Amino acid sequence: MNVKVYNLDGSEKGDIELPAVFEAEYRPDLIKRAVISSLTAKLQPKGCDAFAGYRTSAKSIGKGHGKARVRRTAQGAGAFVPQAVGGRRAHPPKVEKILFERINRKEKLKALASAIAASANPEIVSARGHKIEGVPSLPLVVNAEFESLVKTKEVLEVFKTLKLDADLERAKDGVKIRAGRGKLRGRKYIKPKSVLVVVGDACEAITASRNLAGVDVITANDLSAIHIAPGTMAGRLTLWTENAIEKINGRF
């Protein structure tokens, strides 16, 4: 399958043949597992001190005294039990708890292929909430000169030329303060995802693009399902460079 390659001014440069991965089967179940696997890989096991709440000389006086059979100190205060001050927790976190979603290597690669193919489907991209009216084509491939851009305003001009600015506005207007205690835990704002830019190698465009609302930038070799299907929802609006297409072809 061939698609158009666009210059930075929006004109057509020519055609490029897409790798076969862009025609992979759409498997939302695999995509979900791969994303959850990436998310849970950041977790770490946690537990409590094995003797927490047990360091006390409190003893139980047994039954037949007309009061609860909890262990008591010499002064008669309850201890050791969860409902007592300084007692153990009822159900503390366990190190043995299974936190991670395990996935096979080939299964993970197939999930990425499925997510890449979904990003080229206008129906799936639109259903995810992206504004794609006027976007020349999907997948959207731009000249390799994009990777040499240094200024954020230059990247923004390219986005406007390719009609991606409407989705940037959607992401910018969608930023809101999170409800609940998460505001106190380092995640005050909910920030919608907008365009994903995939480049061939580390370049100036990475720092030039990432300050735009909702925009993420990743190299083709580091691309995974969590980038192109955030929140387990496939169909992210993606901008590819020519070099990125060549690199992706080498991965599959």
UniProtKB/Swiss-Prot annotation:
Gene3D superfamilies reported in the protein's UniProt record: 3.40.1370.10
Record GO cellular component, one term = ribonucleoprotein complex
User: Which pairs are disulfide-linked?
Assistant: none
| UniProt keyword list | Ribonucleoprotein, Ribosomal protein, RNA-binding, rRNA-binding
Domain of life, per UniProt, equals Archaea
Task: Quote the InterPro entries the UniProt record gives.
Answer: Ribosomal_uL4, Ribosomal_uL4_dom_sf, Ribosomal_uL4_euk/arc_CS, Ribosomal_uL4_euk/arch, Ribosomall_uL4-arc
Instruction: Give the record's GO biological process terms.
Output: translation
Provide the GO MF annotations for this entry: rRNA binding; structural constituent of ribosome
UniProt function note: One of the primary rRNA binding proteins, this protein initially binds near the 5'-end of the 23S rRNA. It is important during the early stages of 50S assembly. It makes multiple contacts with different domains of the 23S rRNA in the assembled 50S subunit and ribosome. Forms part of the polypeptide exit tunnel.
HAMAP family xref list: Ribosomal_uL4_A (MF_01328_A)
Oligomer status and interactors: Part of the 50S ribosomal subunit.
Family of this protein: Belongs to the universal ribosomal protein uL4 family.
PANTHER family, alphabetized: 60S RIBOSOMAL PROTEIN L4
This protein's name: Large ribosomal subunit protein uL4
- Organism of provenance: Methanococcus maripaludis (strain DSM 14266 / JCM 13030 / NBRC 101832 / S2 / LL)
